[in-house]
């Protein structure tokens, strides 16, 4: 069976937009290649050959003052009427228990 025929659930991916909120790790040494906008359209383009039917977004280390914003933003992405798969289908947000 070809991988393209398989239904895939991506259980760990990230989206971010450093133009709207701050992600400190994007500017730290060694992460320069990631310091760009990476939205759902980019995710879909990167994996267009795969049959991703659902996905789980894991928090992308947005600054602590923006953790709720990140989950709200991702929910809006999922709810967008142009997003026919409603990705991400699950969101794992950040919670500081310390």
Report the location of each language-model feature.
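Helix-coil boundary/capping segments in enzymes
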Residues: 1-98
């Amino acid at each position: 069976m070809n991988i393209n025929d398989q239904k895939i659930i991506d259980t760990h991916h990230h989206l971010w937009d450093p133009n709207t909120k701050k992600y400190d790790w994007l500017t730290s040494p060694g992460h320069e290649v990631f310091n760009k906008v990476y939205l759902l359209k980019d995710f879909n383009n990167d994996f267009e050959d795969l049959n991703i039917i659902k996905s789980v977004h894991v928090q992308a280390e947005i600054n602590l003052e923006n953790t709720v914003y990140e989950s709200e933003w991702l929910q809006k992405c999922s709810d967008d009427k142009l997003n026919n798969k409603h990705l991400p289908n699950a969101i794992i947000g950040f919670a500081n228990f310390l």
